[in-house]
Amino acid sequence: MYHRLILLALVGTTMANVIPFSMSNIPEEYKEFIPEEVRNFYKDLTVEDKEILRELASKHATFANEDAALEALKDKSDKLYKNAVELRNFVKAKIDSLKPDAKIFVDEIIAKARSLRSDDGHKLDTEKIKQAARDIIAKYQALSEETKEELKVTFPAIAKIIGNEKLKRNASTFLQKN
C-alpha cells in the first residue's frame, strides 16, 4: 500500500502539470497534498485564463511538443504563459535534480500521464488510468531503496500522502480490478 500511495502522489503531481484542471473540483481535505506551487498557479487563474487552458487542452494533440503548446499559450496570454513557464521550470528543476534512475522513473510517469489524455477532449478512461497506475507501481517496486528515498525527499508532498489513512483506503479501492 505504501508504494501505491507514493506512486499515486507522483502521478497526481505529474497530471497536475500535464492536464489543466480546476482546483475547485478537488475536495478540501485533499488540497493540502497538492504542491504549493501548483495550488498557487491555479489559485491565481482568472475565468479567462481557465477558458484559455481548456481551449488549449482540447487541442493538445495538435501540438508537436510542450514547447509548441507553451507558444500557443503565449499567443493567448503573456501573463498566463509566464506563470506556466515558471511552474514548468519549478517541476523541471526538481526532476533535473534527481539521479539517473529516479529521473528515468519520473520521466516514464510523465510520458504515461501524457499518453492517458484523450485526443478528442473527452473524459479520461478510468480503466486506462488504473492500468497505468498498476504499471507504474510495478516499476516503482523494482526501484532501489535509495531511489525510492530520493523520490520522497525531492517530492515532499508524497510524505504527507503516505501517512493519510483515508487516501490509503481510497487508493486501494480505486486500483482494485473489476
UniProtKB/Swiss-Prot annotation:
The residues the entry assigns to the signal sequence are 1-16
Instruction: Write out the coiled-coil annotation as residue ranges.
Output: 67-89, 130-153
State the post-translational modifications: Not glycosylated.
Keyword list (alphabetical) reads: Coiled coil, Lipid-binding, Retinol-binding, Secreted, Signal, Vitamin A
The record's subcellular locations are: Secreted
| InterPro entries noted in UniProt | Gp-FAR-1
What main location does UniProt list?
Answer: secreted
A GO CC term attached to the entry:
extracellular region
Record Gene3D superfamilies: 1.20.120.1100
Q: Name one GO molecular function term.
A: retinol binding
Q: Which family does it belong to?
A: Belongs to the fatty-acid and retinol-binding protein (FARBP) family.
Entry function:
Binds retinol. Also binds the fluorescent fatty acid 11-((5-dimethylaminonaphthalene-1-sulfonyl)amino)undecanoic acid (DAUDA). The long chain fatty acid oleic acid can act competitively to displace bound DAUDA and retinol.
Q: What is this protein called?
A: Fatty-acid and retinol-binding protein 1
Give the originating organism.
Brugia malayi (Filarial nematode worm)
Name the lineage.
Eukaryota, Metazoa, Ecdysozoa, Nematoda, Chromadorea
UniProt gene name: far-1
